[in-house]
Amino acid sequence: MFCRKYAFQTWKQFSRFYSAVNNIRASKTRNIGIIAHIDAGKTTTTERMIYYSGKIKRIGNVDEGDTVTDYLPSERERGITIQSAAITLPWNQHKINIIDTPGHADFTFEVIRSLRVLDGAVTILDAVAGVEAQTEKVWKQASSLNLPKIVYVNKMDRPGAGFSRTVQEVIQKLETRVVLCNLPYFETNKESDLEFKGVIDVIHQKLLKWNEMDANGNEISVVDIDKTTPELLQILEKSRESMVETLGEYDERIIDSFLEHDENYLKIPPILLDQVIRKATIDNYLTPVFCGASFRNIGVQPLMDGITKYLPSPLETSLPEITKNGKEVPKKADDEKGLVVANDNNLTLALAFKVMTHSTRGPMTFVRVYSGKLNAASNLINTRTGKKLLIRKLLVMHGDSPEEVKSISAGNIGVIPGYETDFQTGDTLVSSAVAKRNFTAKDSAYRLLPIDIPPPLFNAAIEPHTAGDEAYMKQCVETLIREDPSLKVHLDEEMGQVVLSGMGELHLDIVRERLVNDMKAKVNLKDVVVSYKESYVGKKEKEAVITDEEIEVVVTLSHTEDARDYIGQEGALVIEGDNNVILLSQTALSEHVQATIDERRWKCENNLEELKEAILNGCLTALQMGGPILGFPLHSTLVTVKRWNAPVEQAQEQALNLMNASRQAVQSLKNEEKDFSILEPIMSIKVYVDSNDLGEVSHDLTQRCKAMIVEIQDQSTQNLETAAWAKDEATKVYVPPDYTIKKNVSKFDDIANKKIIVAETPLREMIGYLSKLRALTQGRATFDMTLIGMRRAVGNRVDSIVEEYKF
């Protein structure tokens, strides 16, 4: 049997290569995300990838809290990834930009804004747990953006690991075709138990075994699979047959090659298989599957090969939506220059997808450059503010360690350091390769597709220890909001508290920890509560008129079911997060103001658009100031500005007067509690539970959580019963037997014994539910929930909410 060492480059070779990594062209660049359920091994796998690329000399450990990508103290303490860390590394003459994203549901916004700037994703699954709830959620998010994906089945060394079972779940739950690029390889130890030792490379027909004596996983023996290894050869033949049949349905070249090689599945050239798998992956026709055990350093290098071979470059993905003055801009992909926008080779467009403040380095803005080249010591313009800025430095990130670069080319991710208040998440940045370009108003008209921010669901109040601590507390809160746009803040004037609103309990717990432990803010922290709303439910439209000398504003208040109906309507300001609309009627302009415009007697220091914006802002402020019951922000409310007037023929500033008048007008309409109701968030939840625990968990949901059970599904067949395609596909794919599960049949529950409870419940009842669920099921159950919408609270629900908030 021929055996040789796998030819990996040394750390020194990679270090020399890295000095030129920033010059690698776009076609050799891969922007990928690491996404999965919490504890599937995302950060551990990323740490191995960094090590094998030569970026670090020692492998970090999540349990010991010394990994590169989890560098916040709260991340290292909890062993989870909270902020997505960006890192650039070299591999096989390619450049891989990795965004390590969170796996906890509370940090979904981090995942969303990371996916927006990626070209592909690696989905990591726990071979014992299979496809978990958060995995399905993030997979759907990635699919909605048409991101090509590969799957890595991790933790194959664990008792109860089931590679084949997990692959079947991928097909059934994630509804995707698969090709198995490698398979797990086991050997029997002295105790007659199976141990995971390596992988079978289906494409190249090799057995890759990792040397147990090499603690870092660098030494890999590569053995040809042939007649001398009959058991492996049989598995390989079946796997090749399944792969060829799947690929043959996509690309006729596979069928032609199969016929040319005497209908022998093993003789089809690996290079052709790689080409077709790549094309099919980029087309989202199928998903390549790899396996390994990252903690034991097995299987990571083939995964890295798969990233460079199968995931797309920035030139091969869907071109980003770019508008100018609301109209689509022409764009094309160029192999040398990357994306070219508006036929201007010098035009640089970048998206600020993340803003954070480092404890020692200060503000850092993460950007994805879409076209051109962003140069250090050059000017750019922020199209949101219209402000021109000189960019002195540019960085690429190695976890928490920056490396200064002269430029960031199209398709790459980097960092702009400094500029504390100049950037926000979602900003479009315009620059030029021409150093002395003069920016114009036309440059400020460019927009890259903005990032949608989901509405927060939980609140937590904070108070300074003393009046002297208030200023620093506010400064810290402002910093956190710039970093995390899914975090909101408002002042409860009645209680004198600053209220933070976030996506979940853990989200707000981390925010509070950062305030106290990282920022050393002296604050008192209140318990997490649900974010309620109030809504106008009066049967008739209410009208108010505010007059003050020559200032006049007339507004009406009514209920709206769906604010999105007003999107695109002239004069409408739609606040989707709160389902509110402020509508400036087309006939709202008074005859006096219209005559002043027609007769060109306008002397007001504000122009017409500024006055309209002031009126809208005044109405918006009133909505956010809350309703008459408990002061919750208004929801599902339509404010219509019927008429307004101001002495615009006078040389005075009128914007503030109109803003105050419109705010007072809306406030005056919120004087009767009987016209308003409290709304509470209603969640759709899925509880993943063993059959043995089904009764007790269902009873707890209906009695304690006030839930309405919609249905109970069989986890193993939920998609097979509803998707004939998935059933057919699952039977076509060859997967080897899960010998490890057979060995542990007495220790581990069969997946067929799993149930899914689908229910609807008020969010208030789900606070602390995970710990209660684990106590009920000895830690075996998990759950996932999504917001259905806001629903009117009635009866005892109103009483409990009032009791909770009135002191």
Curated annotation (Swiss-Prot):
GTP binds at residues 36-43, 100-104, 154-157. Transmembrane segments: none annotated. GO terms for cellular component: mitochondrion. The keyword Protein biosynthesis applies. GO terms for biological process: mitochondrial translation; ribosome disassembly. Keywords: GTP-binding, Mitochondrion, Nucleotide-binding, Protein biosynthesis, Transit peptide. GO terms for molecular function: GTP binding; GTPase activity. Residues 1-18 form a transit peptide. Residues 27-315 form the tr-type G domain. It is found in: Mitochondrion. InterPro entries: EF-G-like_DII, EFG2, EFG_II, EFG_III, EFG_III/V, EFG_V, EFG_V-like, G_TR_CS. It holds the Pfam family GTP_EFTU. HAMAP family: mEF_G_2 (MF_03059). PANTHER family: RIBOSOME-RELEASING FACTOR 2, MITOCHONDRIAL, TRANSLATION ELONGATION FACTOR G-RELATED. Mitochondrial GTPase that mediates the disassembly of ribosomes from messenger RNA at the termination of mitochondrial protein biosynthesis. Not involved in the GTP-dependent ribosomal translocation step during translation elongation. Belongs to the TRAFAC class translation factor GTPase superfamily. Classic translation factor GTPase family. EF-G/EF-2 subfamily. This is Ribosome-releasing factor 2, mitochondrial.
